[in-house]
Swiss-Prot record:
This protein's GO CC annotations: mitochondrial inner membrane
Location of the transit peptide in the chain: 1-36
Subunit structure: Interacts with FDX1/adrenodoxin.
Function: A cytochrome P450 monooxygenase that catalyzes the side-chain hydroxylation and cleavage of cholesterol to pregnenolone, the precursor of most steroid hormones. Catalyzes three sequential oxidation reactions of cholesterol, namely the hydroxylation at C22 followed with the hydroxylation at C20 to yield 20R,22R-hydroxycholesterol that is further cleaved between C20 and C22 to yield the C21-steroid pregnenolone and 4-methylpentanal. Mechanistically, uses molecular oxygen inserting one oxygen atom into a substrate and reducing the second into a water molecule.
EC number: 1.14.15.6
Protein topology in the membrane: Peripheral membrane protein
PANTHER family named among the record's database cross-references: CHOLESTEROL SIDE-CHAIN CLEAVAGE ENZYME, MITOCHONDRIAL, CYTOCHROME P450
Domain of life: Eukaryota
Subcellular localization: Mitochondrion inner membrane
The protein, known as: Cholesterol side-chain cleavage enzyme, mitochondrial
Name of the gene: CYP11A1
Metabolic or biological pathway: Lipid metabolism; C21-steroid hormone metabolism; Steroid metabolism; cholesterol metabolism
């Protein structure tokens, strides 16, 4: 049970009822937003619906409900109970939760020039205790802005993104060949099984290729065990973060718990390998005089003396750590939804093949000719967001739904719950990419927050979007994607949302020659 009287089945039932009560729905649909529903004076913060002010009692109930790994369902249940805004204190952490896109718009439009988001407590504790250098993920104010403006030019600007296309295309083609090898090994004409490990390696090879301009060989038949340890460390870092979210990480460190030791060891490995890669590629790049291709983000940063070397190292480490599990998980969910919805898969394949003909194989042009495919990535992230919330600390007092929320309060937009709310997404359980192509005066950009919003949105957003687009183009050209079982796969919160159990695919090649990709 999620909570007394409300089962998980009731929350996730097909054709589910809206989380918002009819009264709340009519307010949302009639006014298009929450803060202007009432013309009365704003109500005080303590009147926001809440399970109670005893944070430790709330945390006890949260644990009893197994909320730690099911926090996205916990949010949904609370919106059912309290309406479109509620506050909850877990331990000593107090937050306000919202799910209406119009409320999200008000939140983000008030964030100021130096937005601050929630920082994962054990990550902060590790960096502070071991005095590790920090990049834009942890920085704030002018220090954050200085680094971020430089990095935006390297990884967010349209001209910079074009440089990444040939690098990512080569990685994707090698991944397609990995799948063909798997098919040959099974000797059945297709591949059946779990490809999550291959996707992790693909994502790591992709981000290192963009950052360093060189390949690590993660998609070869024999993989460097040291590089694999880096991937394993990232997973361990996410996994061990969860138990320390609602209790002070310093307690785990003080008592030398297994959780803290494993967490610190994971970060140690991440920093060690990231530093090894950065130093190795740095000296290789310095010895080269000319480049026949784009040499990568690291060289571009170093060549212009745009940031101190320690800042570059810290930001490169954060990019590598954030570019593996997140992207690979979204790709896995994308393949899952395509396999669950074969008609949609065929529509996507038809668009890709038409784009290939029109662009004559030019991938830079192709990625501009697949709007439905890009919409399918949005639709995947609506149903399976990487982060269950997007957060901001208020700069000033803010009135939402006629409640005054004080400055410095943490406000969280519940991504997962928003994506499942019928008031904002009709027939929310249906995988329907076309919903993102429809033009309507009632839609808002703030329905899609998977990469955050504004100047503090995900730094790797453009890399991830390009990487996923090129990946799906090539997979759709080469394989028909099916599932071994059509039973729904549940999700668990492991700091990011992951499948509760392995997803087992059936991949059927669309070309007779299994040794080559369709576009070589």
């Amino acid at each position: 049970m999620l909570a007394k009287g409300l089962s998980l089945r009731s929350v996730l039932a097909k054709g589910c009822q809206p989380f918002l009560s009819p009264t709340w729905q009519s307010s949302v649909l009639a006014t298009g937003g929450g803060a202007n529903i009432s013309t009365n004076s704003p109500r005080p913060f303590n009147e926001i619906p809440s399970p109670g002010d005893n944070g430790w009692l709330n945390l006890y109930h949260f644990w009893r409900e197994n909320g730690t790994h099911r926090i996205h369902y916990h949010h949904m249940q609370n919106f059912q109970k309290y309406g479109p805004i509620y506050r909850e204190k877990l331990g000593n952490k107090d937050s306000v939760y919202i799910l209406d896109p119009e409320d999200a718009a008000q939140l983000f439009l008030s964030e100021g020039p130096y937005p601050e988001r929630y920082l994962v407590p054990p990550w902060v504790a590790y960096h502070q205790y071991y005095k590790r250098p920090i990049g834009v993920l942890f920085k704030s104010s002018e220090a954050w802005k200085k680094d971020r403006l430089v990095l935006n030019q390297e990884v967010m600007a349209p001209e910079a993104i074009k440089n990444f296309v040939p690098l990512l295309e080569g990685v994707v083609q090698d991944f397609i060949n990995v799948l063909h090898r798997r098919i040959k090994q099974q000797k059945s004409g297709n591949f059946s099984g779990d490809i999550s490990d291959d996707l992790f390696r693909f994502a790591f090879e992709s981000i290192t290729s963009v950052v360093f301009g060189e390949r690590l060989g993660m998609l070869e038949e024999i993989v460097d065990p040291e590089s694999q340890r880096f991937i394993d460390a990232i997973y361990q870092m996410f996994h061990t973060s969860v138990p320390m979210l609602n209790l002070p990480p310093e307690l785990f460190r003080f008592f030398r718990t297994k959780t803290w030791k494993e967490h610190a060891a994971a970060w140690d490995m991440i920093f060690k390998k990231a530093d090894d890669y950065t130093q190795t590629f740095y000296w290789d790049l310095r010895q080269k005089q000319e480049f026949s291709k784009y040499p990568g983000v690291l060289y571009s940063l170093l060549g212009g003396n745009k940031l101190p070397f320690k800042n570059i190292q810290a930001n490169i480490t954060e990019m590598l750590a954030g570019g593996v599990d997140t992207t690979s998980m979204t790709l896995q969910w994308s393949l899952y939804e395509m396999a669950h919805n074969l008609k949609v898969q065929e529509m996507l394949r038809a668009e890709v093949l038409a784009a290939r003909r029109q662009a004559q194989g030019d991938m830079v042009k192709m990625v501009q000719l697949v709007p439905l495919l890009k919409a399918s990535i949005k639709e995947t992230l609506r149903l399976h967001p990487i982060s269950v919330t997007v957060q901001r600390y208020l700069v000033d007092d803010l009135v939402l739904r006629n409640y005054r929320i004080p400055a410095k309060m943490l406000v969280q937009v519940a991504n997962y719950a928003m994506g499942r709310e019928p008031s904002f997404f009709p027939n929310p359980n249906k995988f329907d990419p076309t919903r993102w192509l429809e033009k309507s005066k009632n839609t808002t950009h703030f329905r899609y927050l998977s990469f955050g919003w504004g100047v503090r949105q995900c730094l790797g957003r453009r890399i991830a979007e390009l990487e996923m687009t090129i990946f799906l183009i090539n997979v759709l050209e080469n394989f028909r994607i099916e599932l071994q079982s059509l039973h729904d796969v549940g999700t668990k919160f492991n700091l990011i949302l992951m499948p509760e159990k392995p997803i087992l695919f059936n991949l059927q090649p669309l070309k007779k020659d299994l040794g080559t990709t369709t576009n070589r």
